[in-house]
């Protein structure tokens, strides 16, 4: 597989073309951002940890019958993925109240949500990733009703699989965001799954083990990521 020119540079990953029109290479960088990219710092080992963490999670999801863009690891910081036609919508599943839900509704952080909630946000940093609903997605042509239904179905299945996986490792899966795209007509899970895009708390102490450590200035960000990886058995 030949790596070619950079196609896109995000806040924490770079995407490269390959000599296969259906495949891309993701490069996980050490860049760490918060507040829609307004604060960016370099954290040693972050790219490596997130790349291998993502590979581990995506393989677990594939084993559970959830289609993902992940193909294989190429090195410490790179992986090969399917080229998706991305849908510009973030799907957020919440099992406990945290983050923007607490701010929007005044709910106490850590409140158990039973059942979970499912939310949609437009993927647009310039607009602050605004909260949207299904009718917006269809009306503005970001996706179809059928695609949305499949995205929700897969998001709930991801929650079922990962809630147990993290629980077995002594962690609460507080919430997470997913992005989806289309590959040869099929809705497929894209982007990544790492502590950058979910909230994970220690089950006993409620210690935060995710990017909130960076957002809130708690320190030991990568140490927390590595502890989560070690608890799951991710080979780093």
Curated annotation (Swiss-Prot):
Pathway(s) served: Purine metabolism; IMP biosynthesis via de novo pathway; 5-amino-1-(5-phospho-D-ribosyl)imidazole-4-carboxamide from 5-amino-1-(5-phospho-D-ribosyl)imidazole-4-carboxylate: step 1/2
Enzyme kind, highest EC tier: ligase
Reactions it catalyzes: 5-amino-1-(5-phospho-D-ribosyl)imidazole-4-carboxylate + L-aspartate + ATP = (2S)-2-[5-amino-1-(5-phospho-beta-D-ribosyl)imidazole-4-carboxamido]succinate + ADP + phosphate + 2 H(+)
One Pfam family matching this protein: SAICAR_synt
Stretch forming the signal peptide: none
Protein name as annotated: Phosphoribosylaminoimidazole-succinocarboxamide synthase
GO molecular function: ATP binding; phosphoribosylaminoimidazolesuccinocarboxamide synthase activity
GO biological process: 'de novo' IMP biosynthetic process; cobalamin biosynthetic process
Superkingdom of the organism of origin: Bacteria
Keywords associated with the record: ATP-binding, Ligase, Nucleotide-binding, Purine biosynthesis
Protein family per UniProt: Belongs to the SAICAR synthetase family.
GO cellular component terms listed in the entry, alphabetical order: cytosol
Organism: Pseudomonas syringae pv. syringae (strain B728a)
Recorded coiled-coil stretches: none
UniProt EC number: 6.3.2.6
InterPro entries in alphabetical order: SAICAR_synt/ADE2_N, SAICAR_synt_PurC, SAICAR_synth, SAICAR_synthetase, SAICAR_synthetase_CS
PROSITE patterns xref list: SAICAR_SYNTHETASE_1, SAICAR_SYNTHETASE_2
């Amino acid at each position: 597989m030949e790596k070619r020119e950079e196609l896109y540079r995000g806040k924490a990953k770079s995407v490269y073309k390959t000599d296969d029109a259906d495949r891309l290479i993701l490069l996980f960088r050490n860049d760490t951002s918060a507040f829609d990219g307004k604060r960016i710092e370099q954290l040693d080992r972050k790219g490596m940890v997130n790349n291998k963490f993502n590979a581990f999670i995506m393989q677990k999801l594939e084993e559970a019958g959830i289609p993902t863009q992940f193909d294989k690891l190429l090195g410490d910081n790179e992986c090969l993925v399917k080229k998706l036609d991305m849908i510009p919508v973030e799907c957020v599943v919440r099992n406990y109240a945290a983050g923007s839900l607490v701010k929007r509704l005044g709910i106490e952080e850590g409140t158990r949500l039973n059942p979970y909630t499912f939310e949609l946000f437009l993927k647009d940093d310039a607009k602050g990733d605004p909260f949207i609903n299904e009718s917006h997605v269809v009306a503005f042509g970001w996706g179809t009703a059928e695609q949305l239904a499949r995205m929700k179905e897969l998001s709930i299945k991801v929650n079922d699989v990962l809630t147990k996986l993290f629980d077995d490792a002594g962690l609460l899966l507080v919430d997470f965001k997913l992005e989806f795209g289309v590959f040869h007509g099929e809705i497929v899970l894209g982007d990544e799954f790492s502590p950058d895009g979910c909230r994970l708390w220690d089950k006993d102490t409620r210690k935060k083990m995710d990017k909130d450590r960076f957002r809130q200035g708690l320190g030991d960000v990568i140490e927390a990521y590595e502890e989560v990886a070690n608890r799951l058995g991710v080979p780093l």
